[in-house]
């Protein structure tokens, strides 16, 4: 106890060891305070038995305070660490527990190691001294560059958002325009094809073209049709001719001659009698014949010829073909060819066929004795023809009663035939075509023999009786039309 105070004056002397470490070395080694603070059995640490008594009794003797927390904080500043045993586990109260501190350079009996114990320098001060100005400037530049990139990215993102909104608006506008165009196209299609689908002849109706000859008259087509009513039964055959008006004439000039008029007649339209007239019915097939006859020229003008028909009963009307030139008539009489008037044909033209040989049916025997064709006719046929054509009953030609196929004069086989006088029958159609001879100089007026035209037709009902004409002969069944080479003339 007397040696400890002697050592105290030497501690504050000049030494590289800090004052706190010297006081702590003396405090731990003082035997008078072993009941409160002492070395551990291993000598590498010291123990504090009662912290409250140690703070009140021992600390004021060596230090200027009696605070145990300040003493522990100074120990931590010099690198001392608190040792916690496994038996305690840190669950007992600190007032009654033993507190143990240790440091690698604070060992019992080795005072020279105290020089290694240093006070901890704050790490922040050392780190601040390591930063250089160039590093700081570089760091600031990088931060500014990152901020610029971020701003440009945000601006680009905003621009993309605006463009996206514009594109969506355009898409909406295009959709509206597309729907409007779709509705307009639908209405156009309905307007164009609606009448075809809802009309009476829309369900698979095959429309055929009826070729009729325009005679140059000033009256309209409806007037021509209504002028001479036609019976629906007589139009079952595809070949029919409408009679011209009495006042109409045809010119022989090629510049004034007009072509045929094409008219549509539906095939499937119902008949006014309520039933469909079939060509294969009870009626028998007859052959109509036409006769060209010379007559004096009309006073209307030179070079014009009128074609007139004089039937007894106007069950169906006949349209006269264009005037035949004299050279053509002579060629037909000599058997060199057939006549086909020029004009617009139907859309689907038949394939051209080779020239047909005209069979030699003998001579008419008119060159002997200066005999005329009228002398060969029976007396019962030589009766005067009526002046005008009076229809029996008004029939709507353009109505749905016009069934069957069409007959064009261009498809008739014009051949020279033998004159065979026959008794008039109710099932025969007799046509008389009269051609006027021109009074001009240099023209041929010698038509001594009549021209026979083979007319193939399926006629039902009353027959047309042509007075003053001769029924020449019946054409054989093998004589088919040019419109359909492979089918019979009576086939629909």
UniProtKB/Swiss-Prot annotation:
Keyword line: Activator, DNA-binding, Isopeptide bond, Nucleus, Phosphoprotein, Repressor, Stress response, Transcription, Transcription regulation, Ubl conjugation
Region (Hydrophobic repeat HR-A/B): 129-203
Region listing for Interactions with DUSP26, MAPK1 and MAPK2, in residue ranges: 245-322
Source organism, top-level taxon: Eukaryota
Entry keyword Mitochondrion: no
Family: Belongs to the HSF family.
PANTHER family reported for this sequence: HEAT SHOCK FACTOR PROTEIN 4 (PTHR10015:SF213), HEAT SHOCK TRANSCRIPTION FACTOR (PTHR10015)
Protein name: Heat shock factor protein 4
């Amino acid at each position: 106890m007397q040696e400890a105070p002697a050592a105290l004056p030497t501690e504050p002397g000049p030494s590289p060891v800090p004052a706190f470490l010297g006081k702590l070395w003396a405090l731990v080694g003082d035997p008078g305070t072993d009941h409160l603070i002492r070395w551990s059995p291993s000598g590498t640490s010291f123990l504090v038995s009662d912290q409250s008594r140690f703070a009140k009794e021992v600390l004021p003797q060596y230090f200027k305070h009696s605070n145990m927390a300040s003493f522990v904080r100074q120990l931590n500043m010099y690198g001392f660490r608190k040792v916690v045993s496994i038996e305690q586990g840190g669950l007992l109260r600190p007032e009654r527990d033993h507190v143990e501190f240790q440091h690698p350079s604070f060992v019992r009996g080795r005072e020279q190691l105290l020089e290694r114990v240093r006070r901890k320098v704050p790490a922040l001060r050392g780190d601040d001294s390591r930063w250089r100005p160039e590093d700081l400037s570089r760091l600031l530049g990088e931060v500014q560059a990152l901020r610029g990139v971020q701003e440009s990215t945000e601006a680009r993102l905003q621009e993309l958002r605006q463009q996206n909104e514009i594109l969506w608006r355009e898409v909406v506008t295009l959709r509206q325009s597309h729907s409007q165009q779709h509705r307009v196209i639908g209405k156009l299609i309905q307007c164009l094809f609606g009448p075809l689908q809802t009309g009476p002849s829309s369900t698979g109706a095959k429309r055929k073209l009826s070729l009729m000859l325009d005679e140059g008259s000033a009256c309209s087509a409806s007037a021509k049709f209504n002028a001479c009513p036609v019976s629906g039964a007589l139009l079952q055959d595809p070949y029919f001719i409408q009679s011209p008006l009495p006042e109409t004439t045809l010119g022989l000039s090629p510049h004034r001659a007009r072509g045929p008029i094409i008219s549509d007649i539906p095939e499937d339209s119902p008949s006014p009698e309520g039933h469909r007239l079939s060509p294969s019915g009870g009626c028998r097939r007859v052959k109509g014949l036409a006769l060209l006859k010379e007559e004096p020229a009309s006073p209307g003008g030179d070079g014009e010829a009128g074609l007139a028909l004089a039937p007894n009963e106007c069950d169906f009307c006949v349209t006269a073909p264009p005037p035949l030139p004299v050279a053509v008539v002579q060629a037909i009489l000599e058997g060199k060819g057939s006549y086909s008037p020029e004009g617009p044909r139907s859309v689907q033209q038949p394939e051209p066929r080779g020239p047909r040989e005209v069979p030699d049916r003998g001579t008419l025997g008119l060159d002997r004795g200066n005999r005329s064709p009228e002398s060969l006719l029976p007396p019962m046929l030589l009766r005067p023809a009526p002046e005008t054509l009076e229809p029996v009953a008004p029939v709507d030609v353009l109505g749905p009663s016009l069934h069957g196929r069409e007959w064009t004069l261009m498809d008739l086989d014009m051949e020279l035939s033998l004159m065979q006088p026959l008794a008039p029958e109710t099932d025969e159609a007799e046509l008389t075509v009269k051609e006027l001879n021109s009074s001009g100089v240099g023209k041929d007026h010698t038509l001594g023999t009549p021209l026979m035209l083979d007319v193939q037709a399926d006629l039902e009902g009353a027959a047309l009786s042509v007075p003053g004409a001769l029924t020449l002969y019946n054409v054989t069944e093998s004589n088919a039309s040019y419109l359909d080479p492979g089918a019979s003339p009576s086939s629909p």
